[in-house]
Each structure stands twice: as C-alpha cells, then as structure tokens.
C-alpha cells in the first residue's frame, strides 16, 4: 500500500496526506517509517498508554516496551512526522502524585508532540467489564459515559473525585506555556512544521479548557441543534435556546481568540530565535546504551526490573549466557 501511495505522490503528482495509527514497535519494521513519510503521513497516533511497565502489563500491552519509546519517537521525528500519543490514567497502581510525576518525565525525556489523556474504562463486553461485574464492583449505569472520557468505575487508590481532578490536572500539566514552547522548539529543530503543531495544540488546549470536552469530540465551533436531545430531556423553548446558544458561542469564540493569540506569541518568540534550528534537549538527544542508567524514565524499581528482563532476553536471543 505504501509503495503504491509513494508512486501516486512522487510519479503522478497527487498531493496525498493522511494520518495513521501505529504501535510502539513500528520502528522495527525495516523502512516502514521512511516509507510512511514518503507516502504522505504527516501525523501519527501512537498508543503509548503508560510509562510504568506494571501498568502496561496489566493492560496486556506487552508490545509496549519503555526501552523502545525514545527510539520509536525519534525515528518519527527524523521522518518529520508529527506524533500524538494516547495516555491512560487510572491503572490500579496510579495515584495523583505518580500520574503527574510520570507526565513530567515524559515532558523532559520523550520527544512526544501531542499527548492526549483517557480514563481507564471497562468497556461493556470486555474482560475488564466482565470481571468487575462478576465481582459486584460499582460501575456507572449510564452507558453514554463509556467513552474513555469519564470515570465509570471505582479505583483502589483514588476516589472518583481525585481521579477526575488528576485527569484535568494532567492536561494542564502537559500543556503549560513552558512546555508548549519546548514542543515548538523541538518541532523546528527536527523539521516538523511548528505551524501545524501550534494549530493542534490550540485545538487540544481549547477543547479541554473552553469546551470542557475531549479534543476528539470537539473543534473550534460547537454546533448545537435544539431538537437533538438525549432521551428523557425536554426540548427548550426557541426563545430560550437560541439566545443562550448565541451568547455562549460568542463568549467561547472570544476565549478561543485569546487562547490563539497567547499561543501565537509563544510561536513568534520561537520563530524569531536565530538559533532555533540548533535547539537540543534531553528528549531529542540520540539514543545511547548508557541512558538506561541515567534517565528518570528508567529509575524506578519497576523500570529497572524491566530493563534487566529485556537485557536478559536480548542476550538469550543472541545466544549469549543470560
């Protein structure tokens, strides 16, 4: 498929651009990332899920290896493709402090462009849902909330209110002005379009802060239809609905404009920096074998145990004594 798309772009001159979703080991496929970029991939969604090996094992994400995250993300950077990653909050070992700590580690050590957060959700029909049902655990009866954007089950180490709060804190922690500047600097230094990064950051930050919804469920203008209501809710009078909708829309658009202008000032600051193309930080530093000893990503006991396990497996794979 990629070969044919490359021909259409490079020989036929068709301007094909698209987004793909990949796993965290896609960089191990020979030439896959390079071909994807040539075929027209401009953005890639990666299910990062978590940086805690125990959480990944609990989510049955054995293919997600924290030792491969930087290699994979830097490979997409080299191909000048913008990355956005999904990150799940609410694994059994999670606490508000641990979640925010891990997000700061990601900011510092992983070259992720956009990060979007989801609640760990026992989707109806899944093994997790069945286990909770058989155990008699509380789960929200409103099926409309099972969209990964609501807390719908209990958590062993957080109350529902704490879980909700850290969900919103996670967005605010990642999308600070300081880190947005870092994202834009990394984009310029690695050949990714800073303008596209700014557009997406504005969208993500505004949907959460202004609309109060997940970015995948919204945009820059919220459309509401008076007669489209959830079952059981009465229709509002046109004399109430339309004036309220107009005022709400105008207020929100002013907030969108303010947000864009604030972020645009960060963008201009970065673009005016004469040394912008020479920017370097820990996250976009080339991978070395020694980093597992120095990076905070690998410093927890769980991470160290995982690194030891991976090293032992590599030795066995190469016929060396473990």
Task: List each language-model region with its residue ranges.
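A structural motif corresponding to the C-terminal lobe/cap of the Radical SAM core domain
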Residues: 5-196, 274-322
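Non-catalytic, C-terminal membrane-associated alpha-helical segments of glycosyltransferases
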Residues: 182-231
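C-terminal non-catalytic accessory extensions
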Residues: 211-322
